[in-house]
């Protein structure tokens, strides 16, 4: 059973090892090699059983192992490797439906109990036996240019290539970026581009599963014909040092995805009928800005970030993030004991509480079908008897909760302990979302809105 690639992509990026991002901002190659490891757990809250019409109310549990290696070739270049091994288990949603016949808006009342007579929204789920594995592998190189007598500009540029593989999915990608510093390193300009080719081969194909597995693995119409997607992205940014304690930055990006029907979720089928159809392309624009403010007297740094997102599916979102980084350095005059040991070996601790708010509007084709409409759709599928046709949804339509209007809040805490050339890092995050936290359509039904807990722990070692 296919999992939510977009969600996992989003989850993986949030957990990414920090080495590459940090080095990309430097103008001289690091002098030491670095190896890092992260173990992460991601656990979604179950859906209220009263809202589940068919299938399991369990959601995804994801375990992620990440590896990072950086090695200097000389004073001006490094090579890198990043690898990920991920396992997933749980149940996947097919669609959301109204239980009334005409699909009208549900009655807004105070009860949380599912009752068909109140037109509450229900969710059709798969069984809870989904088991998936994913492997990512990327290699890269980065080159550094220092300031010289002939040129005041300094910077770096790099590229990486790799793949992401699952039993039914393969993505090949390349990316490159560069940055240059000017005005005595007060101004930094950056730009980059990436390209990915994804191939989907949904399994099992229609008619190849036995009765025991059928509820967990519905048939896969159209997948053998339309299984390619490309993704092209460009970005540009500028960073400015305002004074010794304040840095601001701004970035913009544009991404275009094309996929005939790959952008459609082939795994959203119910009783043999497709219940998901999306446009053949998706254009996405982002603008982000951030501030880093140091307070030297407190050994503190404040991070504030804002991100605007728009796409031609009708989704518009805003994200605001705030974080406080507090550093504690052990400085002791003791001649012996644990405090003396930590002081002599440069032991330091960093804690970083953070909060984030997010809201988005719904895609123009987001809708919740009525049970009657789904039944009619299934009947049309069976009557047509053509597994290679894609005409049962005559217009774009999806009940994917990621395309609904909602808002989200998350809070987390990071921790870092440094000892000589070793650093232990950990963080956790609690996330909740609902239409009531959003700005538009706050009274809509979204019983499958995402809630999750995530933690990460790992080590970095320089040698």
What are these regions (language model features)?
Residues 24-70, 447, 454:
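Short glycine/proline- and aromatic-enriched beta-strand/turn motifs that initiate or cap beta-hairpins
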Residues 39-45, 85-89, 145, 161-167, ...:
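Transmembrane beta-strands of outer-membrane beta-barrel pores
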Residues 47-54, 93-98, 164, 169-177, ...:
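Outer-membrane beta-barrel translocator domains and adjoining extracellular loop/strand segments
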Residues 48, 84-137, 188-247, 252-258, ...:
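Outer-membrane beta-barrel translocator/channel fold
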Residues 58-59, 130-135, 163-174, 281, ...:
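Solvent-exposed loop/turn segments connecting transmembrane beta-strands
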Residues 67-71, 139-143, 176-180, 236-240, ...:
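Residues on the lipid-exposed face of transmembrane beta-strands in outer-membrane beta-barrel proteins
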Residues 77-79, 147-157, 184-189, 245-248, ...:
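Repeated loop/turn-to-beta-strand initiation elements of outer-membrane beta-barrel proteins
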Residues 449-463:
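Outer-membrane beta-barrel "beta-signal"
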């Amino acid at each position: 059973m296919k999992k939510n690639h977009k969600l996992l992509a989003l989850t993986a990026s949030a957990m990414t090892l920090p080495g590459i991002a940090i080095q990309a901002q430097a103008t001289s190659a690091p002098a030491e090699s670095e190896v890092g490891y992260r173990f992460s757990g991601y656990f979604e809250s179950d859906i209220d059983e009263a809202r589940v019409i068919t299938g399991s109310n369990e959601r995804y549990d994801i375990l992620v192992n990440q590896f990072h290696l950086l090695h200097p070739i000389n004073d001006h270049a490094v090579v890198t490797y990043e690898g990920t091994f991920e396992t997933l288990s749980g149940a996947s949603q097919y669609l959301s439906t109204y239980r009334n016949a005409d699909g009208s808006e549900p009655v807004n009342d105070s009860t949380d109990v599912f009752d068909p007579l109140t037109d509450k929204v229900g969710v059709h789920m798969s069984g809870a036996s989904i088991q998936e594995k994913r492997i990512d592998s990327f290699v890269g190189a980065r080159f550094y240019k220092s300031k010289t007598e002939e040129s005041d500009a300094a910077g770096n540029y790099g590229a990486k290539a790799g793949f992401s593989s699952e039993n039914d999915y393969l993505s090949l990608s390349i990316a490159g970026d560069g940055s240059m510093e000017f005005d005595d390193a007060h101004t930094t300009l950056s730009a980059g581009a990436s390209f990915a080719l994804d191939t989907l081969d949904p399994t099992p194909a229609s008619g190849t599963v036995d009765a025991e597995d059928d509820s967990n693995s519905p048939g896969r119409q159209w997948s053998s014909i339309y299984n390619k997607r490309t993704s092209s992205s460009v970005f540009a940014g500028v960073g400015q040092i305002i004074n010794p304690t304040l840095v601001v930055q701004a970035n913009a990006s544009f991404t275009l995805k094309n996929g005939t029907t790959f952008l459609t979720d082939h795994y959203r089928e119910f009783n043999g009928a497709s219940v998901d159809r999306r446009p053949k392309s998706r254009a996405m624009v982002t603008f982000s800005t951030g501030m880093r403010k140091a307070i030297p007297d407190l050994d503190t740094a404040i991070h504030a970030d804002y991100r605007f997102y728009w796409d031609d599916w009708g989704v518009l979102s805003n994200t605001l993030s705030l974080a406080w980084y507090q550093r504690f350095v052990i400085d002791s005059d003791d001649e012996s004991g644990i405090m003396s040991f930590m002081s002599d070996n440069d032991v330091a601790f960093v804690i970083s509480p953070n909060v984030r708010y997010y809201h988005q509007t719904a895609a123009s084709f987001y809708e919740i079908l009525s049970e009657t409409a789904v039944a009619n759709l299934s009947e049309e599928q069976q009557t047509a008897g053509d597994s290679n046709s894609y005409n049962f949804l005559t217009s774009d339509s999806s009940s994917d909760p990621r395309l609904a209007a909602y808002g989200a809040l998350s809070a987390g805490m990071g921790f870092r302990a440094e000892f000589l050339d070793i650093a232990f890092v950990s963080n956790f995050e609690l996330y909740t979302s609902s239409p009531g936290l959003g700005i538009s359509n706050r009274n809509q039904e979204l019983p499958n809105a995402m809630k999750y807990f995530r933690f990460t722990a790992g080590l970095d070692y320089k040698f």
